[in-house]
UniProtKB/Swiss-Prot annotation:
It comes from the Bacteria. The gene is prfA. The modification N5-methylglutamine is found at residue 235. This is Peptide chain release factor 1. Gene3D superfamilies: 3.30.160.20, 3.30.70.1660, 6.10.140.1950. One of its GO terms (cellular component) is cytoplasm.
Length: 360
């Protein structure tokens, strides 16, 4: 392990011990807010401190084993112990390096998922519906809660646009690499000559930001329109103007919500989505800067980035960012997304480790 990594780990272990002492102090216990914050930090550092202690013990074990190599009677046993300790040390080093990677504060949060039909007309809208069901099944398999914020149905099925909120621990961290362009190649049901058509949808995944962290929104910058909800997302056709459309005039961002019967609830949801979109726009600027410096699996943040192709005649799904091709399309469409998500997360960790090493 690099000396710079060891130095960081020693500092974190020292901080862990400090926190342990503070948490046993009656003065800290009396201050509930301070106690809560320190407890959270202590819990976050506990795994690193434990693994680093184990790693240090292994280094001492290897030194002891090496000292026994000169003894003919102990040589065989010492060699065996040394090899075993080396393997364990390498495994722990890898784990500790991953734990040292910079954390994205948004990863632990719930998210908003937007799916929009792109090129391909009716077939694109139908595919948007297929993507929505794919994510809904995945969310269900993870015991996440999915809630429709707004939905605009296509004329022949599917959706022109669908916005949902997915709630649960670590949702954004799992789904953030789904943002971008999703392309489908298949024979549409309306195609009489059996020709394969290519259509596209765009997906945007945005973390749900706590109210106190939302970008400042001035009411004078908003235009708020009300209208009657209809169709999916407001399946009950309302006789009152409960649906809300909010336009943020400086940026041109428009958000609609018509899922609730209450205008007040629709407005609250729409404001939440607006804040998430504004936060996402700020993040996109950072991503564009990073993308120009080094490869970034999130791309530039542009919705048109072509990230994935779903080829139905071949039963194939390809993620172009990591050149991953799987002939398991049925599984993917049924919500078994981990076979795509996990390789992306591993690649992302490898990229971060590489960047961390470059900084040293």
């Amino acid at each position: 392990m690099k000396p710079s990594f060891i130095k960081k780990l020693e500092a974190l272990q020292e901080r862990h011990e400090e926190l342990q002492a503070h948490l046993a102090d009656p003065l800290t216990i009396q201050d509930q807010e301070r106690f809560r914050m320190m407890s959270r930090e202590y819990a976050q550092l506990s795994n690193i401190a434990e693994l680093f202690t184990e790693w240090l013990k292994l280094q001492n074990d290897m030194i002891a084993a090496k000292s026994l190599l000169q003894d003919p009677e102990m040589h065989e046993m010492a060699t065996e112990e040394l090899e075993k300790a080396k393997i364990q040390s390498e495994q722990l080093t890898q784990q500790l390096q991953i734990l040292l990677l910079p954390k994205d504060i948004d990863d632990s949060r719930s998210c908003f998922l937007e799916i929009r039909a792109g090129t391909g007309g009716d077939e694109a809208a139908i595919f948007a519906g297929d993507l929505f069901r794919m994510y809904a099944r995945y969310a269900e398999s993870r015991s996440w809660k999915m809630e429709i914020i707004s939905a605009h149905e296509g004329e022949h099925g599917g959706y022109k646009e669908m916005i949902t909120k997915i709630s649960g621990e670590g949702v954004y961290g799992q789904l953030k690499f789904e943002s971008g362009g999703h392309r489908v190649q298949r024979v549409p049901t309306t195609e009489s000559q059996g020709r394969i058509h290519t259509s596209a949808c765009t997906v945007a995944v945005m973390p749900e930001i706590p109210e106190e962290e939302l970008p400042k929104i001035t009411l004078s910058d908003l235009r708020i329109d009300t209208f009657r909800s209809s169709g999916a997302g407001g399946q009950h056709v309302n006789t009152t103007d409960s649906a809300i459309r909010i336009t943020h005039l400086p940026t041109g961002i428009v958000v609609e919500c018509q899922d609730e019967r209450s205008q007040h609830k629709n407005k609250a949801k729409a404001m939440s989505v607006l804040g998430a979109r504004m936060h996402a726009a700020q993040v996109q600027k950072r991503q564009q800067a990073q993308a120009s410096e080094r490869r970034n699996l999130l791309g530039s943040g542009d919705r048109s980035d072509r990230h994935r192709t779903y080829n139905f005649p071949q039963g194939r799904v390809t993620d172009h960012r990591i050149n991953l091709t799987l002939y398991r399309l049925d599984e993917v469409m049924s919500g078994k997304l981990d076979i795509l998500i996990h390789p992306l997360l591993r690649e992302h960790q490898a990229d971060l480790l590489s960047a961390l090493s470059e900084q040293e």
